[in-house]
């Protein structure tokens, strides 16, 4: 069975943090991978509250260089060094993000005992046997990426079918998986006739962007879409001017892209007391929409 993807919503707020919502940050865990998507101010504290050790981080995906998505990095870098972090920390982001990271170390005169590698990426930039991560350029002030994390569905043998054909356990089953066929007791068996194909799982993150034609194809068929919703429909013109999405646009994107679940994030402080209105607006267009709170966890 494909291993579960777990999303911890460390920060669901917008540019100004509030009592309830921290700057944007999301932790995606899958197997031995701990992927931090954005690192706003206060992310370290949120990790502690979520009982996630910073040393669990294997990769950081930065959507763009704006402070509400990056101000948590200087402290995180120093904490990892203090905790004896031994892994190579790989940071991915749009073109120009290397200059941002270099600037952090220049500003604080800091060094780390562990290796940091910064990669400026677009398109599918990482693929293993189990998963792939891709980036797509969005429309914001500075260059900005959306990200998708795709877990490849497994092919597993169907025990009921094996029993039906009286096929016992043994090395021949390993051969079946490797070659796609096997000879067993004088008969030839094909893998697809004895197996169950699990579906892929896809999680997408769209933060800080104006509506554009690249969003829907990129997030298409996502099991979970974590999408910014900084403005209500009543402020649609302002959202457009500042290059952000409204809750209505998020709902329409989810519906058109055949998404299974929509999570509204990047909630502006102006909606601190009535964020449910954003949820209501999005649900008119896409029913399976939720409004996560900080430290909520979602298993995919």
Predicted region positions:
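Active-site-proximal loop/helix segment associated with metal-binding centers of metalloenzymes
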Residues: 17-18, 129-205, 209-218, 224-226
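Active-site metal-binding motif and surrounding structural segment of the metallo-beta-lactamase
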Residues: 42-92, 117-122
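Binuclear metal-ion centers of metallo-dependent hydrolases, dominated by the metallo-beta-lactamase
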Residues: 123, 212-300
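Active-site neighborhood of phospho(di)ester-bond hydrolases with catalytic His/Asp-centered motifs
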Residues: 37-40, 57-65, 69, 93-94, ...
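Active-site neighborhood of divalent metal-dependent phosphoester bond hydrolases
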Residues: 85-120, 270
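Metal-dependent catalytic neighborhoods of phosphoester/phosphodiester hydrolases
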Residues: 72-79, 101-104, 272-281
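Conserved beta-strand hairpin/beta-sheet module of binuclear metal-dependent hydrolase folds
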Residues: 2-50, 88, 147-149, 155, ...
């Amino acid at each position: 069975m494909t291993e579960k993807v777990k999303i911890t919503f460390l920060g669901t707020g917008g540019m100004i943090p509030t009592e309830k919502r921290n700057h944007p940050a999301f932790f995606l865990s899958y197997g031995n991978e701990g992927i931090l998507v954005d690192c706003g101010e206060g992310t370290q504290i949120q990790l502690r509250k979520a009982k996630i050790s910073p040393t669990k981080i294997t990769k950081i995906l930065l959507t763009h260089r704006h402070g509400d998505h990056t101000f948590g990095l200087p402290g995180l870098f120093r904490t990892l060094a203090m905790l004896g972090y031994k892994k190579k920390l790989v940071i991915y982001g749009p073109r120009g993000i290397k200059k941002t990271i270099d600037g952090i170390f220049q500003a604080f005169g800091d060094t780390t005992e562990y290796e940091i590698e910064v990669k400026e990426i677009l398109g599918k930039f990482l693929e293993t046997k189990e998963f792939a991560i891709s980036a797509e350029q969005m429309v914001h002030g500075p260059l900005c990426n959306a990200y998708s994390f795709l877990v490849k569905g497994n092919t597993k043998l169907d025990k009921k079918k094996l029993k039906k054909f009286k096929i016992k356990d043994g090395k021949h089953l390993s051969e079946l998986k490797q070659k796609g066929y096997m000879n067993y007791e004088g008969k030839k068996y094909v893998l697809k006739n004895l197996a169950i194909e699990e579906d892929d799982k896809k999680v997408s993150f769209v933060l800080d962007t104006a509506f554009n034609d690249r969003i829907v194809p990129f997030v298409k068929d996502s099991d979970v879409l974590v999408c910014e919703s900084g403005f209500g429909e009543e402020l649609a013109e302002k959202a457009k001017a500042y290059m952000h999405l409204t809750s209505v646009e998020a709902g329409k994107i989810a519906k058109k892209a055949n998404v299974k679940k929509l999570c509204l994030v990047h909630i502006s402080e102006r909606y601190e007391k009535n964020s449910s209105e954003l949820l209501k607006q999005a649900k008119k267009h896409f029913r399976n929409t939720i409004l996560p709170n900080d430290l909520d966890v979602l298993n995919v």
